[in-house]
């Protein structure tokens, strides 16, 4: 702590990312990264972008990438906003659409950056408690508020809300912005993008980090009514006009174009997920229904902390949350088939031997 910090810095509780230890080689199943690399076309596009033009600033409008996304979703370019990862877009959205005198609503067990941003920007907020099945109680999100944000599928639970239920939520909040954070939508759910033109209060946020294997580039995008997008651009251009570098723009554009590779790896991950769920259930885990690239599971006898610590000793990282209601759960990213086979093997060993120190 420094004497030069202002009160906000002293008070804020920052987001804590998944651990990335360097002490040994781990199988990383803790940060929901894609286990497969970007496509060859993406890597080639990025290599080609490493040239003398790096002396120049990148395109502040991200026009080529915007055009590619517009073609992909059949939208107008003024309905698309590009950001430095979906986290940046979420931060801009909190600044753009939510006011200090109106309470915003989001689930109590979801992406913890929502709470961080609300407190960082001094916003009034209410955490809506998930029900006993870890479902988001949508009726609670329909009461008077200053805006709503929910992840779909939810993280860390992986549970998905159908489009009809979300349409009802949006209709109940016609005078307020409803943000649907679709970071994991490509692994089983239906995007709300197709309903965008029905609702001028709907903002959909997606990322290239998960299904497009580009977590290292930090590129995300928002889709919504042109007036919402204009608001985001006003905030962006009041902070940093050049949020995406040239290499990232080239790689992201190629990733959107290479839909064949995208479809292949997402299907592969979903297939692996289905297999892993069955194997975990055989080991006496309770696994929540997931439409994401991870599963949320608790064991009927062993604690989440015990399993997490022993897996780490065995060279496997999973995400453990030391929080009320979910402290016995583990969030396990779906890796390659080979990685998940090793996970199941190690779990079988840990549980059968009741090892506390390995």
UniProtKB/Swiss-Prot annotation:
The keyword Secreted does not apply. It is an enzyme of class 2 (transferase). Its cofactor is pyridoxal 5'-phosphate. The modification N6-(pyridoxal phosphate)lysine is found at residue 210. It catalyses: L-histidinol phosphate + 2-oxoglutarate = 3-(imidazol-4-yl)-2-oxopropyl phosphate + L-glutamate. Its EC number is 2.6.1.9. Homodimer. This is Histidinol-phosphate aminotransferase. The lineage of its organism: Bacteria, Bacillati, Bacillota, Clostridia, Eubacteriales.
């Amino acid at each position: 702590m420094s004497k030069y910090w202002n009160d906000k810095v002293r008070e804020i509780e920052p987001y804590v990312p998944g651990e990335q230890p360097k002490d040994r080689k781990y199988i990383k199943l803790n940060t929901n990264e894609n286990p497969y690399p970007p496509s060859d076309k993406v890597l080639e596009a990025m290599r080609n972008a490493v040239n003398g033009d790096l002396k120049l600033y990148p395109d502040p409008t991200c026009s080529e990438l915007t055009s590619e996304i517009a073609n992909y979703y059949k939208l107008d370019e003024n309905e698309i906003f590009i950001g430095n990862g979906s986290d940046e877009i979420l931060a801009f959205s909190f600044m753009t659409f939510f006011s200090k005198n109106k309470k915003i609503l989001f689930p109590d067990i979801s992406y913890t950056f929502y709470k961080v941003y609300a407190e960082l920007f001094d916003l009034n907020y209410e955490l809506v408690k998930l029900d006993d099945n870890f479902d988001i109680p949508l009726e609670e999100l329909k009461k008077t508020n200053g805006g709503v944000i929910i992840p779909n599928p939810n993280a860390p639970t992986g549970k998905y809300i159908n489009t009809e239920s979300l349409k009802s939520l949006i209709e109940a909040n016609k005078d307020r912005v409803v943000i649907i954070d679709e970071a994991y939508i490509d692994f089983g759910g239906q995007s709300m993008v197709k309903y965008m033109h029905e609702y001028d209060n709907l903002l959909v946020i997606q990322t290239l980090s998960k299904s497009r294997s580009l977590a290292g580039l930090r590129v995300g995008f928002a889709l919504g009514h042109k007036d919402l997008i204009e608001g985001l651009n006003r905030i962006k251009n009041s902070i940093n006009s050049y949020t995406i570098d040239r290499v990232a723009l080239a790689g992201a554009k190629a990733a959107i174009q290479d839909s064949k590779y995208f479809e292949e790896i997402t299907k592969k991950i979903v297939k692996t997920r289905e297999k892993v769920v069955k194997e975990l259930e055989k080991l006496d885990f309770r696994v929540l229904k997931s439409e994401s690239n991870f599963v949320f599971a608790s064991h009927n006898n062993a604690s989440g902390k015990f399993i997490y610590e022993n897996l780490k000793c065995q060279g496997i990282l999973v995400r453990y949350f030391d929080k009320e209601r979910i402290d016995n759960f583990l969030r396990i990213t779906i890796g390659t088939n080979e990685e998940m086979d090793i996970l199941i093997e190690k779990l079988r060993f840990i549980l059968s031997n009741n090892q506390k120190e390995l």
